[in-house]
């Protein structure tokens, strides 16, 4: 896991039993609406968690007022309490306010017959300045290789294969758990054998998520894939999943296992390591090799080219250094995927 986030327990079954029944009913109706438009259960659970925090705050500090009757002053009071008393981060406050805003939009558009005068006031109240509270680790290509070497030396071939897939494919940890062994057969090689192209894999997205063909740098990933598959054959590990659940190989590995692995890797690396850092490392490495942003966008599967800049950890100076030197402008040959 690597990074530490302050966890502040606000709700409890005892407190939730005391919240205004109208607030509970409103939340339940909202949840039914979310399911009717195919929002994912993980998204819905996030809404429930946020709203329950708001209801308990209202119980303890706002006279247990029905949400429809909240004023901007109530929003300010809750925000101030979260920031200065409960020590929540600005990002956490923004997320909770986003959930309240979504609920407000639902009331305004769906419940207008019951509450014709209701208006969404959440974003009328300025949010605290967003600033990172967790340490961000920027992994260099050398650090990634050191991690892979150490895991291989220790015989942790499953972990090495996972890191290689994260570092040379840029997928999220939950997505990596969904890869099958068949996604890395010779028939999956494209672009002159430089990339593996998987069958469609469920990725993060609205509703049930979207399905994408995921690309992985074949030459860099294959040695770690081969070692893991050899280990599996020697130890009788049979499963369609690349990373099977140890207790039930018919199922894929759980994200909780990945989090445990990241704690092990953090100890080996000597710096906080979390799975998403490899997504940044992959994007940065492609940029370092001179691939245009529009190509990186297609490889990772982003809809917007702006995502490349978000995940690219290269400094402005590093970028300029690729194109300018002692003799002025450098002439660079265009990098091909087959060169990687």
Which residues fall in each region the model found?
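Short, basic (Lys/Arg/His-rich) helix/loop patches that form interaction surfaces
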Residues: 238, 259-298, 302, 317
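Catalytic-site neighborhood detector that most strongly recognizes the C-terminal catalytic loop/helix
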Residues: 300-325
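Basic, Lys/Arg- and aromatic-enriched nucleic-acid-binding interface segment
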Residues: 141-173
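Active-site/catalytic core of tyrosine-dependent DNA strand-transfer enzymes
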Residues: 217-271
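Short, charged phosphate-coordinating catalytic segments
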Residues: 111, 166-192, 294-295
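N-terminal core-binding DNA-recognition domain of tyrosine recombinases/integrases
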Residues: 13, 28-134
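Conserved tyrosine-mediated DNA breakage-rejoining catalytic core shared by Y-recombinases
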Residues: 178-223
């Amino acid at each position: 896991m690597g990074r530490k986030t302050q966890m502040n327990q606000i709700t409890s079954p005892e407190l939730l039993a005391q919240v205004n029944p109208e607030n509970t009913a409103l939340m339940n109706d909202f949840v039914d609406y979310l399911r009717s438009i195919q929002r994912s259960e993980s998204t819905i659970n996030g809404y429930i968690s946020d709203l329950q925090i708001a209801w308990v705050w209202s119980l303890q500090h706002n006279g247990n007022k029905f949400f429809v009757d909240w004023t901007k002053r109530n929003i300010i009071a809750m925000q101030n309490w979260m920031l200065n008393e409960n020590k929540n981060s600005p990002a956490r406050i923004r997320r909770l306010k986003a959930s309240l805003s979504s609920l407000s939009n639902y009331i305004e558009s769906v419940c207008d017959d019951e509450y014709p005068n209701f208006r969404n006031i959440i974003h009328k109240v300025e949010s605290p300045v967003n600033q990172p509270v967790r340490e961000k680790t920027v992994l260099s290509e050398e650090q990634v290789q050191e991690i892979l070497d150490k895991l291989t030396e220790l015989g942790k071939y499953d972990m090495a294969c996972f890191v290689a897939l994260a570092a040379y494919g840029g997928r999220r940890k939950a997505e990596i758990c969904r890869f099958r062994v068949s996604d890395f057969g010779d028939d999956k090689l494209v672009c002159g054998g430089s990339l593996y192209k998987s069958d469609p894999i469920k990725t993060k997205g609205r509703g049930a998520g979207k399905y994408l063909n995921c690309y992985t740098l074949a030459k860099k990933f294959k040695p770690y894939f081969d070692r893991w598959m050899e280990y599996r054959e020697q130890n009788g590990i049979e499963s369609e999943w690349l990373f099977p659940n140890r207790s039930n190989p018919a199922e894929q590995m759980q994200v909780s296992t990945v989090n445990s692995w990241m704690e092990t890797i953090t100890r080996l690396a000597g710096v906080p390591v979390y799975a998403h850092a490899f997504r940044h490392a992959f994007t940065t490495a492609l940029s370092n090799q001179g691939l245009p942003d529009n190509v990186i966008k297609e490889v990772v599967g982003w809809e917007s080219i702006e995502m490349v800049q978000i995940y690219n950890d290269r400094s402005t100076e590093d970028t300029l250094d690729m194109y300018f030197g002692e003799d002025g402008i450098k002439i660079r040959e265009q990098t091909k995927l087959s060169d990687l």
